[in-house]
């Protein structure tokens, strides 16, 4: 079980559960076609974001495999929500997890995605005792691949025409990091 003490603090960011009051800030980036291009959903309306906050993003703990924890990423200096990150608990027996992230393009290029995702990796390895964490992405999303590489994750798979996404077959990349590798980096 994982029950973090919130907020989770990094050098420049706070990570905390997503609140209903975050809906407008989240909609600002999740309603953009360029942001949603590589995501498994289309652009979201304010109503759809609000619904997700009360359902998909409602967990504040992870109690069993199959659950996910979505956290708001807040810039400490301004108090502004800059994105969200997610930790999936994929398999208890194999101690497997997955990370994901979405950042408002207004905050790209500052290293926030790497900083926030590093905090998620720490939660997964230190808090949940995971052995392996992966990141999966559309192969065309080179910016996302760079994030995972900066975190020390290695490319383990390139699946050709693996997913039918938004009317086209897309390639998928899978990056991974083992707990021991994480410990050597931190």
What is the predicted function of each stretch?
Residues 1-37, 54, 70-186:
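Acyl-donor (CoA/ACP) binding surface of acyl/acetyltransferases
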Residues 36-45:
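A short gly/proline-enriched turn/hairpin at secondary-structure junctions
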Residues 27, 41, 63-65:
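Short, surface-exposed helix-loop/turn micro-motifs enriched in polar/charged residues
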């Amino acid at each position: 079980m994982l029950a973090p003490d919130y907020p989770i603090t990094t050098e420049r960011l706070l990570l905390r559960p997503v609140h209903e009051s975050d809906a407008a800030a989240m909609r600002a980036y999740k309603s953009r076609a360029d942001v949603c291009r590589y995501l498994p959903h289309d652009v979201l309306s304010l109503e759809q974001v609000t619904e997700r906050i009360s359902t998909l993003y409602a967990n504040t703990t992870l109690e069993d495999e199959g659950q996910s924890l979505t956290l708001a990423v807040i810039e400490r200096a301004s108090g502004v929500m800059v994105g969200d990150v997610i930790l999936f608990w994929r398999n208890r027996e194999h101690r497997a997890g997955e990370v994901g992230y979405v950042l408002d393009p207004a905050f790209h290029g500052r290293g926030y995605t790497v900083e926030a995702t590093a905090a998620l990796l720490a939660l997964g390895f230190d808090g949940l005792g995971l052995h392996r964490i992966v990141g999966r992405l559309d192969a065309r999303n080179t910016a996302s691949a760079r994030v995972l590489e900066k975190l020390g994750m290695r490319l383990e798979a390139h699946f050709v025409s693996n997913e039918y996404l938004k009317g086209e077959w897309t390639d998928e990349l899978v990056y991974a990091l083992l707990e021991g590798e994480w410990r050597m980096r931190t």
